[in-house]
């Protein structure tokens, strides 16, 4: 007891001697509002804190009001933008460089005097101590509090506004403390500046955090792209032009079933904009809808102005035309393209190199990691999948973020950096696809605008629904069960949006733009082939064709076991395949007539954009991708436009066996015959080409069975029983039904 009293007296003495002790707690005590006696109402802990809060002149109310005051309002979209939030606001592993602050000049040290007293660290002032304690309190304060709703900051979800209305917070009130459950702060209501967007990863984040996600993308663009750092050229100016463009071309989607199903929906509706893995970059970028042009293109002010002017010229056909200002040779790289990594782990970097390797394998374009040059590309793991278009000067970016981890998506974004736009923006797209505008998200119509022939360079190649640069079927859809792009020929629906490989036309465009002078000697290549810039002695052939001049079927993974040349005759022929190989078949009619193909059976994994598939090329131009089938719901009956047709079976990327049955004949008007006995070639297993199908028996089996003596004599019971048993056993062995049919 005496020890306790002694400790208590020592504590009181320390209080008297501490000159700054009461000053440190002065902000917690009641001020002009009347203060509060901490022991006046000791019935509850919550009451104790309420008394500490005091009146309007001081207490925890004033302290927490400062700690929880609304952050600065976002800045308006315009040519200049305020810095976006720092990296700590986001779940990322990259290091986005912050804008460099102006360095302060270090004070010149004074020369020490011989008789000068030693210099010690100056003690903190009262104000510094108070501020330090406030910072600690903001971090560790356990109080439960409720926010009096005040007008939310004015923001439009993609850039901070500079002239936001001032918001004066009302005093905070406190609810009784309830241990251990802590209440959460109510998020601010969406401001009138625009709808909110759902973040890339599905969460229940507040609109303020969603605005941060988009602001982070703008910070990335400003940090990694030199093209947007000059005055009136930053991405804020681009977005101002882009939003005006979207509003000008928006159709409103006011009619049709899609409009009725989507009544009341808006661009910012959260469920509609959550990320969706559809195998394309558009699915991963849903949260950035209308913040990037056509979902994944970072344009310069010059490029965006050209698009706006072209849209105006399209509505005024008598005006002056702008030519080739946004793509093609205007933004072509000069030689080897330097690139650098910013952050990322080894697996992510390997994926980038594989995507670049797809282009290097098929073209003369080469990429140099950390190579020299003032113009270069920075790969980083950003807010989504997006890229600059063409060479824009200085450093430019390609973001391969979470959800974009596919080498086909990498190849797509690299295609943009080489100077190419989306395939469906070509002027001739209406000959191949149809837009279902009723199902397009309202306000995103501008992402489907066609370019004019004056704006683009098609490099003399036809439209290709199988291009790696083509939108998928569900681009900008308000309902994932409904497609927005429908192919005119329904058989090609499973072809668009593929990200498995570069198409022949993708490669040919790049080679014509970058490699046209590599091979000085022309070759008489067939079917649209051309000298291969990686080997000028042979032709670069369309998919499915090979040989020096593209005159025969290309070799598959096992050319000796599947693939080759087939001849169509006046009689039906049939092929049944089962395995996991890539095979290429060329079917030709020797008399110059057309070829009829019938696909009667198919076993592949069904997908919106086929990964493993049967591809049939039956048109006159073998450069274009054929129609790909992986979802079998009907028999495909095709007649070729010429005397040849190609069948490509792609199954080497799957871990299961695929199978299909194909019949062909020289087209002469004959009806498809009933199924005949066929030979099923199963690589690596026993093959019996004489076996019948469906237990009906073939010619050889029936001949063997009929050659057995049939004894049915009641006077010879032993021989009769032996004959019946032998006939039954042999029929079972040969796969023939026991009724003899």
From Swiss-Prot:
Binds 1 zinc ion per subunit. Zn(2+) binds at residues 412, 416, 422. Residues 71-122 are annotated as: Disordered. Residues 71-85, 97-118 have a biased composition (Low complexity). Residues 324-516 form the Peptidase M12A domain. It comes from the Eukaryota. This is Zinc metalloproteinase nas-30. SUPFAM superfamilies: Metalloproteases ('zincins'), catalytic domain, Spermadhesin, CUB domain. Its cofactor is Zn(2+). The keyword Lipoprotein does not apply. The keyword Protein transport does not apply. Keywords: Disulfide bond, EGF-like domain, Glycoprotein, Hydrolase, Metal-binding, Metalloprotease, Protease, Zinc, Zymogen. SMART domains: CUB, ZnMc. It comes from Caenorhabditis elegans. One of its GO terms (molecular function) is metalloendopeptidase activity. Metalloprotease. Disulfide bonds join 364-515, 385-404, 519-539, 541-550, 562-583, 610-630. Glycans are attached at residue 633. Residues 550-648 form the CUB domain. One of its GO terms (biological process) is proteolysis. It is an enzyme of class 3 (hydrolase). The active site is at residue 413.
